[in-house]
Structures are given as structure tokens and as C-alpha cells.
């Protein structure tokens, strides 16, 4: 524990919290334009072709964002909404594209966790919830 004299000489330093998604500039989401849509392979124990997009945000940053869910309709010049959130097995991917907003369509035939994939209540889901009652 420092003495009062030591504290007078140099005050305690505040620990600054480093943001995990600096390109969003303290906003929950940002709009961006797809520059390139492609697939990448994950880190060592995993094996797949993960769909990602290079996006230029309205903040001026150019980031790599993950496209969640099965299948997508994204092409070059598509306008997308980007949120924070990394993908653990893809180095350098610190953002997710929000499904079901702007030019991004929701996941087809999705019944569970629909809100995360931009899917409205469909006849398939309505029948399932009616059957539970």
C-alpha cells in the first residue's frame, strides 16, 4: 500500500476499458456496405467453410463480419447491419451481420431461436405452438 507522500508524487492511474468492437464507435449496431462475400476455414480443431463478408461501415472502418445461419442472400454492394460479437474459431472476425434487417434476409424454415435469425412467426411455428396448448 502506498504512503500519502507516494500518492501525492504520482496519483493512482485509472484503468481504461478497451472496447472489443472499436469500429462501432460505442453504438450497438452500424450500417455498412458489403465489399466482398466469401468463405474462410476455421482454426485448428474445427473444419468448415464459414461465410463472412468484408464490410465498409458508416464510421469509415473496413471490417470482417460473420454471416450467421444456414444460407444467405448477400452479394457485393448489399447494405447490411453489423453488430459486435466475435467468432471464436475465426481469427480477426469480431463482428456479426444482423439477419432479417436491411438487405439481409432471415434464415429460411427456421423454427427455434427465430429472433436471432430475423424470422417472423410462420405457419409452421404457429402450428407447433398451437399443438403445445
Swiss-Prot record:
Database matches in InterPro entries: NA-bd_OB-fold (IPR012340), Ribosomal_uS12 (IPR006032), Ribosomal_uS12_bac (IPR005679)
Phenotype upon changing residue 91 to L: Streptomycin dependence
Pfam family, one: Ribosom_S12_S23
Domain of life of the organism encoding this protein: Eukaryota
Keywords from the UniProt entry: Antibiotic resistance, Chloroplast, Plastid, Ribonucleoprotein, Ribosomal protein, RNA-binding, rRNA-binding
GO molecular-function terms, A-Z: rRNA binding; structural constituent of ribosome
GO biological process: response to antibiotic; translation
Location in or out of the cell: Plastid, Chloroplast
Single GO cellular component term: chloroplast
Classification via SUPFAM superfamilies: Nucleic acid-binding proteins (SSF50249)
NCBIfam families: rpsL_bact (TIGR00981)
UniProt similarity note: Belongs to the universal ribosomal protein uS12 family.
Function, as annotated: With S4 and S5 plays an important role in translational accuracy. Located at the interface of the 30S and 50S subunits.
Protein name: Small ribosomal subunit protein uS12c
Natural source organism: Chlamydomonas reinhardtii
Amino acid at each position: 500500500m502506498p504512503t500519502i507522500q507516494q500518492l501525492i508524487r504520482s496519483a493512482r492511474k485509472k484503468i481504461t476499458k478497451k472496447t472489443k468492437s472499436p469500429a462501432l464507435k460505442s453504438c450497438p449496431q452500424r450500417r455498412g456496405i458489403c465489399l466482398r462475400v466469401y468463405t474462410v476455414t476455421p482454426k485448428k480443431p474445427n473444419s468448415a467453410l464459414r461465410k463472412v463478408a468484408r464490410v465498409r461501415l458508416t464510421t469509415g472502418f473496413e471490417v470482417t463480419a460473420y454471416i450467421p445461419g444456414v444460407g444467405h442472400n448477400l452479394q457485393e454492394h448489399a447494405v447490411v447491419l453489423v453488430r459486435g460479437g466475435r467468432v471464436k474459431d475465426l481469427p480477426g472476425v469480431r463482428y456479426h451481420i444482423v439477419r432479417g434487417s436491411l438487405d439481409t434476409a432471415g434464415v429460411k424454415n427456421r423454427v427455434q431461436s427465430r429472433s436471432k435469425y430475423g424470422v417472423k412467426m410462420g405457419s409452421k411455428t404457429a402450428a407447433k405452438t398451437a399443438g403445445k396448448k
